Amino acid sequence: MTRPPGASFAEFFPTAPKVKAQAQTRADQVRDRDRFKTASTPATINGTIDSTTGTAVLEADANVSLNGIVSASDTMPTQPDDTESPFTDIPNTVDSASSYSSAASSIFSTSTRHGAAATTASSRLPTSSLTPSAFKESPNSAPAAAKPDMSTYQTSDRAARQSSRNSPATGPNVSISNGLPSNERIPARDPLPSVKGLRCTYDPLLDRVHNKSVSKSAKPTYEEFGREDDAPPPKDPRLARSDGRLGYINTDYYLPKSRLRTAPENIKPYPYDPKTSIGPGPPTQIVVTRYNPLIPFSKVTAIFASFGEIAESSNKMHPETGSYLGFATIRYRDSKRPDRPPVSGIDAARRAVRARGIKVDADIVRVEYDAEGRRSRRMLEEHLKREKEKFEKIEQERLALAAKAPPTGPKSGTAPAFTRPPPTAPKGPSAQRQSIPTGTPQIPLLGTQVQGLNLEPSNLAQKLADDPYIYVTGDSVPVLPSILPHMKKRLKSYGFEEIRVDKSGYFIVFRNSFTGSSEAERCFRAVNHTEFFNYDMTMQLCLPRPRREDGSGRRRSSASSDRHTHAEPRYRDEKDRRRREEEADLEEEKKQRAKNFDPVIEAVEVVRREMMEHLIRHIRTKVAAPALSDFLDPANHAAKRRKLNIEHPDDLQEIPSIEDGNDSSRVGTPNSRADPIERRTGRLEPKALPRIRKTKVKGQAQKSAFVDPFARKRPPVARNAFRSLHHRLRSLDSDAESDDDTDTRALLARETEEADSRPRSRMSTDDEASKDDFVPWEQGEDDSMTEASFAIADTASTRKRKLVASLESVFKRQKKSDEELFGVNLETLDSEFKGREDSVDIIPEPETGDDVESRVSRSETPASAIGKPLKKRPGKRKKTKKASFEEPEAAKTQPETEQQPGDEATEPSKVKQEKAEKTSMEELVPEKFDEKLFATEPLTPALELPEGAKPDLPIFQGLTVSAQDIPDLAKLARRFNTKDIGNAELWLWTRNRIRELNSARRTLDSPVTIGGYYVPNPTGCARTEGVKKILNSEKSKYLPHHIKVQKARQEREARNKLGRDAAAEAADAARIAAEKLVAKGNSRANRATNRRYVADLNDQKKTLGQDSDVFKFNQLKKRKKPVKFARSAIHNWGLYAMENIAKDDMIIEYVGEQVRQQISEIRENRYLKSGIGSSYLFRIDDNTVIDATKKGGIARFINHSCMPNCTAKIIKVEGSKRIVIYALRDIALNEELTYDYKFEREIGSTDRIPCLCGTAACKGFLN
């Protein structure tokens, strides 16, 4: 592009001294020139002007005559630029060998001078006098900034003088004044012929090259030029080459600036500089289009940030819907970063626009300049215009369809205003009823056509007489246009064909077949009288009438054709109406959202709702509950109970039994996983299902450990589902709050806890309770190594007698059936099975009262599988002979295991039991025998089994069999795969030695078993039991830490029986252990090493100051102890020491994610919802919590103990608080690490967490 001419210095500064001096000089020159013109002969130009053609013939000389046509179209003088030079190349075609000649050649040529004078006179002078206003671009009408050509004035003056001197006036003359304009520039040279310069005609230096005889004193000769009028123009030296003009044009590679250019060339613009440039400058903002509006805008900005630093970016959105439109504007700014080269915003925008093929995901975007945002604004307006046109087109189509529909009745003059409910209102009929039209109130007529709903004639029921349909009356569900789509969505699970509407209601039509009738009946049964928004959907089922032979097919075909004829247009109208309603809903929602977007109003609504909830809770807990409690107090209704002969509620108190598993008193620890109301009343239920309260009725049959398989099945007794309300209002603490209030109070109590050094975890949650509740275990199967697992209530002798009596009747039936089945007298076999080791325990061991009070509930693994009621068997199965023998022996040995040394009250019951068993056994002996069933010769026993023997190799060795009974080894080898064991005798000897070592009696006959380890399945088969955890009672037989805990528990139980206070002794032992310092003897080398280590520590103490905790933390790498985590006897996982740890040694740091208090509460709720039962949250202060649930170390596995061996300290290191675990006393190898969680004591709280540490000083609860 060409650079436009700039303003001159004189225009900007007209009062400058230099400008004034130049103006004065020009005025003097003009004055001198005028004086010269008046002194000479007046110049007249004789010419002939043709009136028809407007041609002026000028006669300037006898030899020079030029005729020209002067017209407005031909006379267009060019405006010279300020930068023009008089020596530039000027095209010329008069008397020149080249079409391009220099300015000097045109000035010094006579013919050129005459031609130029004639041409100028013919093209300038007549136009200035004849048509001065017809040329806007002429020098006279040009602005002051235009500068006329000096050569033009020079040639015109010379032509004027010659014409006035040589041409007399003849014929009709036209005198044209030759006055110069007032702003005419003074010529730089004298217009008259004068010496222009000197030309060297002889140069002796050049002549001496060819002629050596030239004298050295010879001087060059010069000749003046310029005075001749007819001097030929000088030749162009560039054309003096041998190859001429073509060689010059084509060989300019070594002179690129002298290239011949036949067309103007764009000059490179100057770079923009805000300091010297005027105007907005090049654009720095671009607009990006054609990308997917659904992708994140960060991807677009990330791609265009590679061109430069982005100052601002805007993803254009729809002003009404808020949806993105798919184009954005990005503005760049100058980037001056020390690590990168500087990039200006102009260059960044230019690079972004010039880049090709930029992809955003799978779309190639388009980038254009948008300096002031006009392009993006125009695109937004076009988009809105297209949407408006589209909406208007749809509206016109709707109106056209409405105009084509037949009128259904008179319409009122004023149409009701279509108002929409607020966005928060439901999109149902209730929301439509809230919109009250403004204007003249109208009475709704059922006969008129509802907007968007095509009503059919009133005889629709007659048309559908042969089809199954359901009729919904208009009284129950009003006929509104918004009801129909919601009704279709509600009934979409039923196979209806269509829903037709008339002024009386809705007709839900089904297919005329057996399937359609079935679907209609199913829909009627499921949906009739159900809630549909705020309406009661009342239905009437109308099945097709019985078919008649005459005309039934004709009626059915006519009804079907009528229905299908109207189905298609109704479907289209319904689809269009639904789409228009959705668009109207969207527009109204936008308006309401923009109108109601006020955070203050929303905050007021939130506060109002919370205050309403608190008020209702306060009324329910503080007003209603005490009033109901006082009203339902049994003492206030004593007279009425006596009148109606009703028992006192205290007489209905149930007695806990062993079989029920409820062996703890009301004073004991409540079950944390039981129902909240049952926890408050202190009553333990045998099962804890999630949020389902189990009720008991007086006289309910208790399940025993054994179920009589031969007893008659009694009909089930109808039980009341709920007890009367006074059962729950016995104690004042149970009527204070409901379940929801209990949960709310627990949350509030948790929020108001003070900051303490404890992890907010290890709590029993509802999720854990619900998980454990689905496991078929009873309360007696508590999996815990604490004293609670072995604590049993004191049992009465009367209860034992009842149990024995029930067992005797069972044994009688079993023995009788066995005798009939096997033909064996069981009396003769009683002696063989006395003193069996692996007999099944039936009654658990009794426990002391102290153990009952210290019992803690823990529902993980059952402690005993016999103490619970048996499951309902899937079917009766016959017992084996072995099982039949084991049960009576178990009944015999059980009273012996129950009997305690000091229990004298059970002696009479034992004697009675023995007598009853003896009499029962005698009664079972048959009086007469059938001699045919017995052999006549004495029998020789082939196999004599020792006591408690099982099939094994020693049994086969002592077996005396005949040759017929010996198995065929060759046949067995072909049938089964064999294995080579080498020497059979050596293998047998090795196996017998191993069996002797593993057996209890060191014999081959005794079984290799662990006493009490084998527990039979209650259902008789392991497959029917499902998956169970291993009981802690079984783990205590082989796991070291369980064995240690069990031994300590047994020692405490023994001390309690002797009357010693275990808690006091434990406190004394802890105090002695804390004060005791173990002196360890070391060798000489060890002592020297310790001295060096102590000296090193002292030096570091001096450097760090007196803060010993900080010093210990800095030595964590040197003093960290090796620990491991494994299954704990206290709870889930635990941390164990892998070496002996001395007192006050640092063990490990509690590492986790540091979060704020508010974030920790949100995370705790999230963990509970996601099923994470335990959350490892450790509070540092009021505002900081360490969360080690998902990011943390193994220190989170340290359990709580009331007699801990560690402590947690919070120390400050380099401005941040850290949690470090220290040893309180000497810790042995493989000892579990524990510390006190230090929960706040909540005496009287209904949501207390039981403690499971099992120590002598256990407080029972964590809180």
Swiss-Prot record:
Q: Which residues form the SET domain?
A: 1121-1238
Annotated catalysed reactions: L-lysyl(4)-[histone H3] + 3 S-adenosyl-L-methionine = N(6),N(6),N(6)-trimethyl-L-lysyl(4)-[histone H3] + 3 S-adenosyl-L-homocysteine + 3 H(+); N(6)-methyl-L-lysyl(4)-[histone H3] + S-adenosyl-L-methionine = N(6),N(6)-dimethyl-L-lysyl(4)-[histone H3] + S-adenosyl-L-homocysteine + H(+); N(6),N(6)-dimethyl-L-lysyl(4)-[histone H3] + S-adenosyl-L-methionine = N(6),N(6),N(6)-trimethyl-L-lysyl(4)-[histone H3] + S-adenosyl-L-homocysteine + H(+)
* Compositionally biased residues, Basic residues: 869-882
Q: What class of enzyme is it?
A: transferase
Annotated region (Disordered) at: 72-96, 118-195, 211-243, 404-443, 544-592, 648-688, 749-783, 833-922
Tell me the subunit arrangement. Component of the Set1C/COMPASS complex.
- Protein purpose: Catalytic component of the COMPASS (Set1C) complex that specifically mono-, di- and trimethylates histone H3 to form H3K4me1/2/3. Binds RNAs which might negatively affect its histone methyltransferase activity. COMPASS recognizes ubiquitinated H2B on one face of the nucleosome which stimulates the methylation of H3 on the opposing face.
Recorded protein name is Histone-lysine N-methyltransferase, H3 lysine-4 specific
Gene field: SET1
